[in-house]
Amino acid sequence: MKNTKALLEFWEEQMKQSHRSSNYFFRKSPSHYHMMLLVMSAHKFDQKLSVEELKTKLFKTSRPKSALIINEACEKGFFFLERTSTDQRKKNIKPSESFVKEFDDYIITLKNLVL
């Protein structure tokens, strides 16, 4: 029960943070959270993830909606786009250094709250 209370307190603290923070942005919808996990998974496993691949992998999200979320995440500085060397039309999506740190801190805190 103690860990459940700690998890609740952690969640409430996350939600109190600025509306411009990544904590708020990626919890707006399941699609936002799923996108964060897909991008960070590719980053952690040192895999390339193109914008088109990301749009395809997001379930129950239209391509225009996916594009809006990606653009907003880039505008807020959580992700950035990098053109590939082989095909200048293709762009890979990567997390910013500051977002990687926020994500790592988030994961460490969650691990410490094991129920």
Task: Show where each model-derived region lies.
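Short amphipathic alpha-helical interaction segments
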Residues: 60-75
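Short, cationic-aromatic polyanion-contact patches
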Residues: 84-107
